């Protein structure tokens, strides 16, 4: 066979350290999938007890330690005053130069300017971005020109199956609210104030 020297670099999850930021429903689903690849799964979520993280086969860790240890960082936090710019210059400085960060949660959790700088300066290896601080993003957004970022237009949840599931869950939540409020999980609601719900 002719030797080919320009093979692309692919990376495995096998025995790699994955840091999940946010361990709600989506974070837990990500953990399940990472387990299938035999990854070491670390979780940072100050609102989830360590025993709950451990019972899902994951290792609880503080934010700084997790960022320093992780090969892959995946963000699954809600956007609020506490999580805005949750990842910025300081956090990028803690990461491995070989780390890959993925945000499919909300734009603004990762400071976009800091992300662009980290990618340009090879502070981190690469990023996957499904969400932006401004949506739709400006056509001149520097992320579009970087070779080490994979972008998608906030469509990570737009599979046919996912849309059907969301519609079914929304309808079931309405039924539960009208018939028996004890059946609905209010902890997942992000707009309780706007809905003026009496809980």
What are these regions (language model features)?
Residues 1-17, 29-32, 185-188:
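Phosphate-binding beta-alpha-beta segment of Rossmann-like dinucleotide-binding domains, i.e.
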Residues 17-19, 101:
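Conserved hydrophobic beta-strands of the Rossmann-like cofactor-binding core
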Residues 23-24:
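Glycine-rich Rossmann-fold phosphate-binding loop(s) that bind the pyrophosphate
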Residues 31, 35, 119-120:
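Gly/Ala-rich phosphate-binding loop of Rossmann-like dinucleotide-binding domains
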Residues 38:
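Short glycine-rich hinge loops at helix-strand junctions in the catalytic core
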Residues 41-43:
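Short beta-strand "acidic-cap" motif of Rossmann-like dinucleotide-binding folds
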Residues 46-142:
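Rossmann-like adenosine-cofactor binding region
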Residues 98-199:
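Rossmann-like dinucleotide-binding domain for NAD(H)/NADP(H)
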């Amino acid at each position: 066979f002719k030797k080919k020297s320009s093979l692309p670099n692919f990376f495995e999850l096998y025995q790699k350290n994955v840091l999940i930021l946010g361990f709600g429903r989506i974070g837990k689903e990500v953990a399940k999938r990472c387990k299938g690849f035999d990854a070491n799964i670390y979780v940072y979520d100050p609102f989830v007890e360590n025993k709950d993280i451990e019972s899902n086969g994951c290792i609880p860790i503080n934010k700084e330690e997790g960022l320093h240890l992780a090969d892959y960082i995946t963000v699954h936090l809600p956007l609020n005053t506490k999580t805005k710019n949750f990842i910025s210059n300081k956090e990028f400085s803690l990461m491995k130069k070989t780390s890959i960060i993925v945000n499919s949660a909300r734009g603004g959790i990762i400071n976009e300017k800091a992300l662009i700088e980290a990618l340009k300066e090879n502070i981190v290896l690469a990023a996957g971005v499904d969400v932006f601080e401004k949506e739709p993003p400006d056509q001149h957004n520097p992320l579009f020109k970087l070779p080490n970022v994979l972008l998608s237009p906030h469509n990570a949840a737009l599979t046919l199956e996912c849309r059907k599931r969301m519609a079914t869950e929304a309808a079931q939540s309405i039924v539960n609210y009208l018939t028996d409020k004890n059946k609905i999980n209010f902890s997942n609601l992000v707009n309780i104030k706007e809905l003026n719900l009496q809980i």
